[in-house]
Structure formats: C-alpha cells, structure tokens
A protein has these predicted regions:
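Primarily recognizes the serine-hydrolase "nucleophile elbow" in alpha/beta-hydrolase
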Residues: 97-147
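Short beta-strand element of the alpha/beta-hydrolase
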Residues: 34-43
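The serine-hydrolase catalytic nucleophile loop
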Residues: 44-56
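Conserved alpha/beta-hydrolase
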Residues: 58-78
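N-terminal cap/lid segment of alpha/beta-hydrolase-fold proteins
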Residues: 1-31
Length: 147
C-alpha cells in the first residue's frame, strides 16, 4: 500500500458552551482534491491519544482523519467533568465534530466514516444510525453495545 504524507493540526470546537479539542491529520493531496473523512472516537476512560495511531494510519492511506477528546474524558484536551459524560453527551460531541469537519474544503463530505473504540464504538454506531445519509462507513473495535 502506498502511503501519503500528511499534516497535523489542532482542532478546537465549542459544544454546549464547553471547549472540545483534538487533532486532525490532513493528507497533503487533500488541498487539491478533497479526501474522505474518518472520525475516530475513543473509549470511556481514554483520550484522543488512544485512537491517534489509527487516525495517522487513515491519513497515510489518504483520508482526512480526526481524533478528539469527548468532553470530560480522561487526560482530556476538552472541558467538562467525567461525571457528566454519557453516551448522549458524547453523541453531541461527535455530531459537532462531524458538522464542522464536513465543512472543511479538504473533506469530501459524501465519503464519511466513523471509527470507534469501546464506548466510542457505541457512540459511533448511534451517530451512524442517526445520520445514515451522512455516514457511509462504520468500523467498530470492541464496541460497548450493551449500554
């Protein structure tokens, strides 16, 4: 498989009045030809660093890849309390990232995938069910499907 070079940049959004942070990995070729989008979701006690290796692999394969911290996540670049986290607050975070990233000029918004680990997998599945017209692929790694 041919790998592509990519740039990394910090991502900051405001969701329900709180900061949400993470990283985006953008293939250099996406500036001239929009690329598919993959949003990577970490598990309950994790942070974006847990799924960042997968995001970098997706970027090397030619996709714009984002890994972010759910608000309240452990070691989080985002605001919020862990005790306030739920699948629904994480779903709101994911939907905010999805909406923002689909507006980026580097992203082909007709090709969007979600990757989720553990609780992030359950949240990714919820988002895919809620937005079937926007999300075209779903990859779940040990998803917490019994909520």
């Amino acid at each position: 498989m041919t790998t592509q070079s990519y740039l990394s940049r910090q991502v900051t959004l405001t969701v329900q009045g709180q900061r949400l942070g993470g990283l985006a990995y953008v293939p250099r070729t996406a500036s001239s030809t929009p690329a598919p989008l993959v949003i990577c979701c970490h598990g309950m006690e994790g942070s974006h660093t847990r799924v960042a290796p997968m995001a970098r692999r997706f970027a090397a394969a030619g996709a714009v890849a984002i890994c972010f911290d759910f608000r309240g996540g452990g070691g989080s670049a985002s605001q919020g309390e862990t005790t306030a986290m739920s699948a629904l607050t994480e779903l709101a975070d994911l939907e905010a990232v999805l909406t923002a990233a689909c507006a980026w000029p580097e992203v082909d918004a007709s090709r969007v995938a979600l990757f989720g680990l553990s609780l992030g997998g359950a949240v990714a599945a919820l988002a895919a069910a809620r937005h079937p017209q926007r999300i075209t692929a779903l990859a779940l790694w040990y998803p917490a499907l019994r909520l």
